[in-house]
């Protein structure tokens, strides 16, 4: 019984964090386009360091948002490298607005 409760708590916490992270990223993307590194830094700063999502975890969330049609990307040359900028789509804006109303 205790194991089931612990597992349920862990799953609930994971789902809450995932949903909150998606919402916060969309909220930031509503302001402007960001590339992943600066998006990670802004999320950490704005959440008073409660959300420190970096590297693979951040890309997993961004790819999931992209698969849902909530985020699009564009490439931009920055010196010798190409930066991928993320942009909230109209569907992402609608999704975010509905979440904020609920």
Where would I find each of the regions flagged by the language model?
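Intrinsically disordered, low-complexity serine/threonine- and proline-rich regulatory segments
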Residues: 1-20, 99
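Beta-hairpin "wing" of winged helix-turn-helix
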Residues: 66-82, 87
């Amino acid at each position: 019984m205790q194991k089931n409760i612990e597992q349920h708590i862990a799953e609930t916490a994971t789902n809450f964090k995932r949903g909150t992270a998606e919402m916060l990223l969309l909220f930031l993307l509503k302001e402007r386009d960001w590339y992943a590194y600066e998006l990670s830094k802004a999320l950490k700063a704005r959440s008073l360091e409660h959300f420190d999502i970096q590297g693979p975890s951040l890309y997993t969330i961004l790819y999931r948002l992209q698969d849902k049609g909530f985020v699009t990307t564009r490439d931009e040359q920055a010196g010798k490298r190409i930066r991928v900028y993320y942009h909230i789509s109209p569907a992402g804006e609608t999704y975010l607005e509905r979440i904020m109303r609920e």
